[in-house]
Amino acid sequence: SRFIHLSTDFVFDEKINEDAGLLYTEEDIPAPVNYYGYTKWKGEEKVAETCSSYAIVRVAIVYGRALPGQHGNIVQLVMNRLKAGQEIRVVSDQWRTPTYVGDVSDGVQRLIAHPTNGIFHICGVECMSIAEIAYQVADYMGLDHSLIHPVTTEEMNETTPRPRFSGMSIDKAR
């Protein structure tokens, strides 16, 4: 049997130069900025250390239709707020490579049959800010852009630190 471990882009610390168009690869050294990222990184290490057949799958901002009982995702949050005529604040200085849940499913299915152990990034090809994601949702759904308010990470004042940039390359998974 093969062990598939789902991980996250939050294992990274934003130190790569996004201005140069660089995305994190599977070979980049994790340096998480929060406890969630730290526990995922340590989980990756334990899987690699103890499993003889494994794949570590890093995903970022997974979106798609949520099943009953599941929490929503960025697409549903933006869509629901805008449809209700509610304003939404979104960060404009955090960049991710959002991932469609169907692509995660397809990638995991392929990795189950793949003989090589290792880390694989399964995410979208486009790196964009959270605000850009919100605007794309509004465009796709024909909803009001004026309700979207881009703010900086500092202005959002979240209690848990998040990496400003955690865009991942999917070259290895291709």
Spans of model-derived segments:
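A general structural signal for well-ordered alpha-helical segments in protein cores
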Residues: 71-76, 101, 130-134, 166, ...
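Active-site loop/turn elements of alpha/beta-hydrolase fold enzymes
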Residues: 8, 59, 153
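Residue-level signal for the nucleotide or nucleotide-sugar donor/cofactor binding architecture
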Residues: 34, 96-99, 128, 168
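Mid/C-terminal beta-alpha module of Rossmann-like enzyme folds, strongest
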Residues: 105-107, 114-165
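NAD(P)-dependent short-chain dehydrogenase/reductase
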Residues: 46-96, 103
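Catalytic helix-loop patch of NAD(P)-dependent Rossmann-fold dehydrogenases
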Residues: 2, 11-57, 61-63
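Short, intrinsically disordered, charge-balanced linker/junction segments flanking boundaries
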Residues: 172-174
